[in-house]
Amino acid sequence: MSPRVRLIVAVTLFGCLSSPIWSRQISFEHILGANKEPENWLTYSATTFSQRHSLLSQITAANVKNLELQWIYQARSLEKFEATSLVVDGVLYAVQPPNDVIALDAATGRIFWTYSYHPEHARPCCGRVNRGLAILGDTLFMGTLDSQLIAIDAKDGHPIWQTTVAKARSAYVITHAPLIIKDKVLVGVAGGEFGIRGFIGAYDSRTGRQVWRFNTVPGPGEPGHETWGGDSWQTGGAPVWVTGSYDPALNLTYWGTGNPSPDWNSDARPGDNLYSDSVIALDADTGKLKWYYQFTPHDDFDFDSVQVPVLADIEWQGKPLKVMLWANRNGFFYVLDRTTGQFLLGKPFVKVTWASGFDERGKPVRVAGQTPSLDGTLVYPGNPGGTSWYSPSYSPRTGLFYIPAWVNSSSMFVKLPGPYHEGRDYSGGTARSFVPFNWSPAPNFRKEEEGYGAVLALDPQTGERKWEFKMADVTEAGILTTASDLLFSGGREGYFFALDARNGELLWKVALGAAVQSGPLTYSVKGRQYVAVNAGNCLFTFALRQ
């Protein structure tokens, strides 16, 4: 951001210094104990276990029909509004595209302050989006589309420090919400369609100094380097663009990684291409790899495994076990031992044709002929996958895992050889889907035989589908469950709805006039529970009729 823009922002913000919106410091212990204060939403996925399950219960199956719109915030951008807001003691912190932070009264929508940042040389693949913030003490943290990490005073919006994470001209971008662990701010870099070399970095929350870095594409001398042919590791991708999770008992942080580069011309990168399309478990203090599991070795399909790692403590074969639940873009649902990374279960939750199952080590068994070709190859699931970055939820009350899914959707995968050029597209082909993306100008000509969107409820013990809520269109909305056994979600068709989490019964819905492309959140102010969600370029907030 230029000095002139900095001056304009500073003058604007100093005029708002008198806004009395702050009462206490948010310590890391507060974040770890987020379930003890469900009136707030302190991290991207509600807790470091990323279950997106709230203990609030004022809104129930009996009264959810009485939800009424309380206020709307309209963003000053027409880009996709994908961020999950934070809520701290009655103040809601939102990010509007591309990188503007807004502090609002969570009960009324009144704006306290706005911090505007204009990313320079940003080259995102898929929209100028941001998915949220992190908070520690009285400081907010935001990653930007030009790969900056910025610390912002939560009281008045004044920038505190700014550090460069990666080179924006090479198409490194940050789109996800940072994750706070102890006194560190963790972020990863996106840019897998441009041949970046992915990594996750930890930064000192006070200064912005890098503390450690883990390369998701290992270089010479690093374990896993042998899974890359020639010099392909230098442009290997494996981006990180969705927020990870953390288990304090194990001191492990878990992150999903994206596709290897180029996406569809895998001839350019022989080998399994570690650690692309994997979950990696890192020591939170040092960044050292403890274990990994690769969902799609030598990915041909752009099946990013950046889904949120959902942590749960369940009974497994009669014994208590720390597990990780994962619905992958590749169409399979997984259960892993999160202490060791051991593969416990893999089962398709949508139609899958690229793999027939798993070997004894948990590695997928590829189906012959199911690879991109010059003429195009039809594969299920399609390029959008069975699911993607939109957040699932796990309810300890029902014991079910809930997925926003693209059911029975396919693509024609085409590979096109081509050279790498810094900062330019390096996809190596294309994927033709029968369902237009929601940012496409093409009309939506979806037919039922081409797939549909749904909320799926899975039994983690078996991977079996317990119920399905079918939508008229596909979905890019996350899921929220609550202690009153409600499930909130939405879809591209423009509805926001509440289901009975036990059986999928529709209890309430409202038309918002635009696609829901974020995860709902819930919070309370002065004893009143609210539910908020983004649709189009607006933030809608609901509460029970008074």
Please tell me what each predicted stretch does:
Residues I26-L69, T216-P223, K363-A368, N444-F445, ...:
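Blade/loop signatures of beta-propeller domains
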Residues P38-E39, D89-G90, G137-D138, K182-K184, ...:
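Short coil/turn segments that connect the beta-strands within blades of beta-propeller domains
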Residues S50-A168, T482:
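N-terminal cofactor/phosphate-binding cores enriched in small/glycine residues
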Residues Y73-T84, T114-A134, Q162-A177, F194, ...:
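Extracytoplasmic beta-rich repeat domains
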Residues D105-T108, D153-D156, S205-T207, A284-T286, ...:
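Short loop/turn segments that connect beta-strands within beta-propeller blades
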Residues G198-R209, D272-G287, T340-G341, G453-P460:
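Beta-propeller blade signature
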Residues S518-Q546:
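Blade-level signature of beta-propeller repeat domains, shared across WD40, Kelch, NHL, RCC1
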